[in-house]
């Protein structure tokens, strides 16, 4: 919803659940796309095609092993980044657990802990994070308010509109807010978003 509000303010239209029938460039350098959504034509100056990510696991020679992949081509791993073949681990983008540098590094930490440590780290212990590199950028770490409440936490919420943040005012980017969610019983940090 937040991304839609940002795009609406920029006069960027989003079309959901539609397949492209055809796309062509017009004489005035605009692009027209015909979609299955009511057969509508959409004309604009730019076209963003977001098709998702595909791992390059087909280049690893896995067909010569018994290592299993899922239907999207990611290598199947358990909570410890172990494949179905004993002693073989899959870390980073190839396991489908998050295509981020910090996630890949955490995969390494889990495997290192399994091989040389206390064997007590696992993927499910990972704190949920994400970032959307749009303008303004969006990001989250940990639980949302809804998740915290549904997990039985009594929460405190610190909320600060961006129009009250000096740096945001200085840059003229005052849309949105920052928020932190804290466990009201023990002051434990549960999550934050911007």
Regions picked out by a protein language model, each given a short descriptive name:
Residues 2-14:
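Helical element adjacent to the flavin cofactor pocket in flavoenzyme catalytic cores
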Residues 9, 21-22, 56, 94-194:
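Mid-to-C-terminal Rossmann-like scaffold of FAD/NAD(P)H-dependent oxidoreductases
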Residues 13-14, 41, 68, 154-156:
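Conserved beta-strand segments of alpha/beta enzyme cores
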Residues 16-18, 71, 159:
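Short loop/edge segments at beta-strand edges and connector loops
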Residues 24-41, 47:
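Conserved beta-strand-loop-beta-strand element in the redox core of flavoprotein oxidoreductases
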Residues 25-31, 85, 171-176:
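A short, glycine/Asx- and small/polar-enriched loop/turn
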Residues 27, 37, 63-64, 71, ...:
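Short acidic-glycine loop/turn motifs at beta-strand connectors
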Residues 41-117:
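FAD-site-proximal beta/loop scaffold in flavoenzymes
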């Amino acid at each position: 919803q937040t991304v839609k509000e940002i795009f609406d303010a920029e006069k960027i239209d989003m079309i959901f659940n539609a397949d492209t029938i055809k796309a062509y460039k017009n004489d005035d350098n605009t692009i027209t796309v015909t979609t299955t959504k009511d057969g509508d034509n959409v004309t604009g100056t730019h076209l963003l095609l977001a098709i998702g990510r595909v791992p390059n696991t087909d280049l690893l020679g896995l067909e010569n092993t018994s290592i299993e992949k899922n239907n999207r081509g990611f290598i199947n791993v358990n909570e410890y980044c172990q494949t179905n073949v004993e002693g073989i681990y899959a870390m980073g983008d190839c396991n489908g657990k998050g295509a981020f540098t910090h996630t890949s590094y955490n995969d390494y930490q889990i495997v290192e802990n399994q091989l040389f440590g206390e064997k007590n780290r696992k993927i499910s212990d990972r704190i949920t994070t994400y970032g959307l590199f749009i303008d303004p950028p969006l990001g989250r770490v940990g639980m949302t308010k809804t998740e915290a409440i549904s997990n039985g936490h009594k929460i405190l919420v610190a909320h600060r509109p961006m129009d009250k943040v000096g740096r945001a005012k200085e840059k003229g980017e005052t849309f949105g807010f920052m928020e932190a969610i804290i466990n009201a019983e023990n002051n434990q940090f549960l999550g934050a978003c911007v």
